[in-house]
Amino acid sequence: MITVSNLAIQFGKRVLYKDVNLKFTAGNIYGVIGANGAGKSTLLRAISGDLEPNKGSVELGPGERLSVLEQDHFKFDEYRVLDTVLMGHEPLWNNMKEREALYSKLEMTEDDGNRAADLELKFAEMDGWEAESNAAQMLSNLGIPEALHEKQMSELSNNEKVRVMLAKALFGNPDNLLLDEPTNDLDLDTVQWLEEYLSNVEQTVLVVSHDRHFLDAVSTQTVDIDFGKVTVFAGNYSFWYESSQLALRQQQNQRQKAEEKRKELEEFIRRFSANVAKSKQTTSRKKMLEKLNVEEIRPSSRKYPGIIFQMEREPGNQILEVEGLKAVDEDGTVLFDNVNFNIEKGEKVVFLSHNPKAMTALFEIINGNREAAAGTFKWGVTITTAYLPLDNTEFFKSDKNLVDWLSQYGPGNEVVMKGFLGRMLFSGEDVLKKVNVLSGGERMRCMIARMQLNNANCLILDTPTNHLDLESIQAFNNNLVGFKGNILFSSHDHEFIQTVANRIIELTPNGTIDKLMDYDDYIYSEDIKALKAQMYNK
């Protein structure tokens, strides 16, 4: 249990929130949402003790332990991978180190012997004898093979370090768990494992995430940071979003009678409660929904960008033909081989792979930015493309302001460019910012504005939700669903894939798995699982 009392946090003159009084209880997973800069990560840092609040206090239940997903991926470079995970249970780790120091002595005093006996008793109580095997199992579940367990953290890639940090946070079943963007850099299979793991925990969990499906799958309550306040609502992200949209519509219709509004809200709650009846947390969630005061629901202050992709030209029937394509990484690793497919009009294809470099390599090849190791590709004569690369660093090395930067990529005067930027939530003095000082989210919104200028009939998107907040992801997602052209994309966002893709192509070192089916059917199909095992392990 975590009790927050009279918490206030401000930076300079800017007050993030004040008078925060909340109690987070065991058995609940709280999804923390809010606009970029609202203070989601700051709240977790204040709870963990990493940040001193301006006022107020945070208390854990008596004797309880708190674990945090570390954001510094270099902090443990000098340690063994397995030891890093074991450090997640600090009392156990300290016990192990003290035992090791005692037993390394050439001679032990009587006091040493008594202390060793105490340590052994506590070691057993903390399941110390199974600790290494449990830590190893946690690493394996998160995609870290046994061959890496004895290596130094400094030898791992950043993607691998992220998984070790997550294993460290989860290890030892802490009473309270704080997870800031836990799905970042995880493949979809590992995210699915994490969803299953968290759905069965009995601890108190707070999680910040921009993955809507993940939030919906795991959270029983939503912590909304808005209007300078921190408010807890019953239900998951989708319930919060739909209820907020409903409240906005009602606010806009001022003539609607109060009683009609109340009935509409109550009917909405009943309907949503029925829709979540299949969830694992259904009993507790339904009880919370029943207690919800409909008068508490209010429109969000958050803004959604206006993302509209329009085609200048209708595509013909020949979109893209790929034959025998192969890509090899710099170290000689085969990313994919013998890739053959034809893209037909209207198809929105998600590309998957165990190795994220495979999708990037494919997109770079078909955009002419990289040579294939073998094979050919051919675009249809009517096709125009707009490409959103994974790494956009090169686009933002100039000191141009946003208007001048965007003007490079399409026709139109300053007013037109400001209009595009305004729809992407850049207004007033923002449009005069230098592009080389933009945040990751601001850069991504600029890249999306650039793509809209192209009026292309085929969009190529490499992990497009990176750095975007939930509002931008929602707006992006909604427009792509209605886009009439073709889309080729990769993503770690389950909801994004499920709602946009109508075809799935998985790239493996031994060819492709190519299916016309939705994503949920694909990941839960036993036949597909068997086929994947075969294609990756030939």
Each PLM stretch: what is its role?
Residues 1-253, 312-538:
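ABC ATP-binding cassette signature C-motif
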Residues 103, 107, 241, 270-273, ...:
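A structural signal for long alpha-helical coiled-coils and helix-turn connectors
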Residues 113, 186, 283-294:
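Extended non-transmembrane interhelical loops and adjacent amphipathic helices
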Residues 136-142, 267, 271, 287-292:
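Short amphipathic coiled-coil heptad-repeat segments
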Residues 143, 185, 259-260, 298:
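Short helix-capping and inter-helix turn/linker motifs at the boundaries of alpha-helical repeat units
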Residues 251-271, 278-287, 303, 308, ...:
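ABC ATPase nucleotide-binding domains
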Residues 277-281, 291-301, 378:
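Proline-centered turn/helix-capping motifs that create local helix->coil transitions or kinks
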Residues 297-321:
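Amphipathic heptad-repeat alpha-helical coiled-coil/stalk segments that mediate oligomerization
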